[in-house]
Amino acid sequence: MKKYKLSILLASAVLGGVGATYLSAEVNEVSAAEVKTEVVTPATTTDKNEGTPAGATTSAAQVTAPKEVKNIGEVQGESHESPLVGKEVVINNVVVTKTDKTGFYVQDKVSDNNPRTSDAVYVASAEKVESGDLLKVQGTVKEGYMEEYSVRPGQTFKKPAGSLTVTQIINATITKLGKTDLPKALNISEKMPKDIVDNTPTKYNPETEALDYWESLEGMRVEVTKPKVTGPQYKGDIYVLPGDYKGQKLNNIGGVNLRPGVQNTEVLPITVGNSFVAKAKDYFNENITGVVTYKNKTYKIDPIDPNALKGLLQDGGLTREVSKIYPSEDKLTIASYNIENFSANNNGHDETPEEKVDKIANSFIKEVHSPDIITLIEVQDNNGGVNDGTVDGVKSGEKLAQRIKSLGGPDYKYTEIAPVDGKDGGKPGANIRVAYLYNPKRVTLIGKEKGGSEEAARFVNGHLEKNPARIDPKSVHFEKVRKSLAAEFEFKGERIVVIANHLKSKLGDDAIYGSNQPSVENTKAKRIEEAKILNAFIKEGLRQNPNLKFVLTVDFNDFEFSDSVKTIVGNELVNLMAEHEQGDRYSYFYRGSNQSLDNILISKNIKDKVVFSPVHINASFMEEHGRASDHDPVVVQIDFSKPAAPVSPEVKPEQGSTSNKEDKKDNLISQDLGEVATDANNDVPKSKTKEVTSAKNVLPKTGLDTSSSLVFAGISAMMAFFLGRKKRNN
């Protein structure tokens, strides 16, 4: 397999026209000048007793005598690229282990016992063979992409940028030697390197790096012990852990959470097809055997008999949740929900069907219990993906509000600021944005003029000048990105600023198992700059009004431990997801791991008055189970039944900090949801409740502070004044 220098060869129509087409989101179209075309002809077959037929296929490249190799390991080599690329080889005594529509896998009947080289290779051929056939294979060695064989006649193959290649034999002549037993399948998890994908790209280390370990098994028969499913089937793949997995601690649904600085290399993708229905916590009651392949920028296991898998899958019993946070008269409930490209357009592919509208509306009523304020992420304009210059999304938002009401929920009001056409990223023509639903019987959107699409939000005298308003919409850091939307609400006399966010996506990051190693988060720097803008906005609001309350909601497109989220938090906020129970700390599922793209941040002046929880109704499930979006909603509730203590302005020291433990009773984030508190930095369980300590210097008291000393001084002055008047009157 080729790791860095990616050559391209175009398969002929003989091998095309079948299978699901895959085109990467990051692709470079290959021009005719860049493509080396090889006509892959049907392999000719001989019987070992009949000799070579007169019609045996040859090519211009077969001028010199083919190299007879001892085993497939010589073809694969101890690297990601075959040392024999472009050479014609002859391989004897190889066994067919699996067939597909464009070829088959063969493996050495007798291993070379070198764990650093694969014993198997893919043969691109239309020849009819069966599993267990013993063959002699003669053909040309190629490094290519499995996606090539999904290209239909008349289509142009586009190289998947950043993808590895697969070692193949093309232009093959096949000689059948008989039948034999299949090689024993290796337990793929037994020697899988933990955490590290590839830290030394110039060296080949299958013993310590997962990328190289997978390469050393390319095409080989492997086995997974009674796999446990970690998440829903997506694009024909499921991700599993072996039933005897003994690695990191599992989360509450038997999966693994993403962790800082490492990858969950032990999670294994298995190809099952788009019709396969599975969710987190399901499991197989038998071992699964398959061959190792590579497609869509990841290694995966292609089962020997995919049709048998449905009969082996057992229901793990996971059901969609209902929030443990219920409405209360003196408590403000705020939910945030990425509703995945929602619009009023229900006509056409990739638009919003009525069934989805019902599912999302019902989730707000039945599973999230009709929150007072809802921040909506991924609202599209009124006609969705129709690229006609429409930017207004009021019909989209009001359609959801009306559906909630018709199904028995509150009569929500909708507010947004439409973006400039084509300026906020997302699906072309859809003009994605963040927006709000709010219950006017519970909260008031402070009545001020609404900000413009390119007008930056400002604080004047400690409150938003315009409401709602977009935060720094002209910043270069928010180009082609959804602009954060600030809105100031009043609840029972309390003012609170809610900020809905949808930061730069991760599209453009290197694939974890791609050709660029170590993989780089190319989008990270932009999110950090966006985070700095948000943190500065919070600081200014608190500078003007230290008692102003803030809630920042999803989607940050980053994790609770990420630099970008930590930058937003700064010294002014608390990340409730980072404080949440470790086993429940997720809202999204991607390539085998549970993760927390959806965080809720609050200002420290309400940290002792809140409860928080993600509500797991989507990320672990498929549409067949009721899934309405790819994200779970997250909910925070603030208890305003007793006033919060006044807060003085604070600044974060540039060098060092002073940590003073405060009274534990005043420092707990309420967790009546049965969570186990963990250290936010290293996830080490500490106690049943988590103490939040102050790590900041406090400025001198100002006139805004209502400290007891000032109150006492004021009372003393008033008493002196009235006593003086009494004496004069007497």
Give residue ranges: language-model regions.
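Gram-negative bacterial Sec-dependent N-terminal signal peptides
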Residues: 1-27, 710-725
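A cross-kingdom C-terminal cell-surface attachment/processing module
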Residues: 16, 669, 684-727
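Acidic beta-strand-to-loop metal/phosphate-binding motif
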Residues: 16-19, 139, 372-379
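Low-complexity, acidic Ser/Thr/Pro-rich repeat tracts that form intrinsically disordered stalk/linker regions
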Residues: 22-73, 77, 85-86, 644-696
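Extended non-catalytic accessory segments flanking core domains
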Residues: 52-333, 337, 341-347, 351-370, ...
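Divalent cation-coordinating acidic motifs and surrounding scaffolds
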Residues: 54, 62, 303-646
